[in-house]
Swiss-Prot record:
Biological processes per GO annotation: translation
Region Disordered: start-end pairs: 44-76, 231-316
Gene: rplD
Organism (species): Synechococcus sp. (strain JA-2-3B'a(2-13))
Superkingdom of this protein's organism: Bacteria
Ranges of Low complexity composition bias in the record: 255-270
This protein's GO CC annotations: ribonucleoprotein complex; ribosome
Protein name per the record: Large ribosomal subunit protein uL4
Residue stretches in coiled coil: none
């Protein structure tokens, strides 16, 4: 934020005004001003320079002389670029030199240029009422009271251009009068002093002031807590089909008893009826060895082990 003095028509300091504009960064300020200045000066060119080629010059359709037999050099047209009044080779052609620049860049360049001249900026009170009738001598004397010497140039910026001010200033070659809507980078940088009225400065601050600058959105930091996920926004892997089955459930599934149909099939293969009560409710009853022999079945291994010593003693 910078401050500049405010002077009245008599050249007395009556206060100060603050000027705080959103400008370019120091490392890019010179480049943005260069782009704006180049665009303004290039677009001021008319581009009317134009020359005619040998095809556009009038005449030259007839061959001057025959090709052979005259001893002269071969010639096909009197409008050849080698001849007098002939066409021009690679001459200037009508063209447009307009350069484009983004609107935000142009505004940034204007704010930067004006803020850079704050040390040479003088705010003056509105003096339209003092020019009645408009006199050039009155404005020239006021410039001296404001501190603008006779050999120094000045740019006078007013809110609205009135006829009285224009008639009083137009005969002073070193002073240029522009309205607030005509402010440009070239005029701001090409003078020794910049004079602006109080009303024009207020409108300028309302249009370009720091309060009117767009707010910068805060970007969330990495340490900020993340928002809770809504219940209806399920993440992949949260569905019932995606949930993993615990190993204990697999083990219980493996330990479940077989179905009745499987029991019947197994009993049919072994040649015995299936037990409808299942394997857990079956009770094994010991059978008599004599009954097993009568049925043609072999005695169990335990019984064979008990009867084997008795048979050996009988043989002895």
């Amino acid at each position: 934020m910078a401050s500049c003095v405010v002077k009245n028509w008599q050249g007395e300091t009556v206060g100060s005004a603050e000027l705080s504009l959103k400008v370019a960064r120091p490392e890019t300020a010179a480049h943005i001003l260069y782009l704006a200045l180049r665009r303004q000066m290039t677009n001021a060119r008319q581009g009317n320079a134009h020359t005619k080629t040998r095809a556009e010059v009038r005449g030259g359709g007839r061959k001057p002389w025959k090709q052979k037999g005259t001893g002269r050099a071969r010639a096909g047209s009197i409008r050849s670029p080698l001849w007098r009044k002939g066409g021009v080779i690679f001459g200037p052609r009508k063209r447009e030199y307009n350069l484009a620049m983004n609107r935000k860049e142009r505004q940034l360049a204007l704010r930067t240029a004006l803020q850079s001249r704050v040390e040479d900026l003088i705010v003056v009170e509105d003096f339209q009422e003092q020019l009645n009738p408009p006199k050039t001598r009155a404005v020239a004397q006021a410039l001296l009271r404001w501190g603008v010497m006779e050999d120094q140039s000045a740019l006078l910026i007013v809110a609205e251009r009135s006829e009285a001010v224009e008639r009083a200033v137009r005969n002073i070659a070193r002073v240029k009068l522009i309205g607030l809507d005509q402010i440009n980078v070239f005029d701001l940088l090409n003078v020794d002093w910049v004079l602006i009225t109080v009303s024009a400065l207020e409108q300028l601050k309302a249009r370009w002031g720091s309060d009117a600058a767009p707010a910068v959105l805060e970007t969330p930091s990495e340490d900020a807590p993340q928002a809770d996920i809504a219940e209806d926004q399920a993440l992949p892997g949260d569905g019932p089909e995606d949930q993993a089955v615990p190993e204990s459930e697999h083990e219980e599934a493996e330990q479940t008893p077989a179905q009745p149909e499987a029991q019947e099939n197994q009993a049919a293969l072994q040649g015995r009826p299936a037990d409808p009560q299942g394997p857990e409710e079956q009770t094994e009853e010991p059978q008599d060895p004599a009954e097993e022999l009568a049925q043609g079945a072999e005695p169990s291994t335990v019984e064979e082990a008990e009867t084997a010593p008795a048979e050996e003693e009988s043989d002895d």
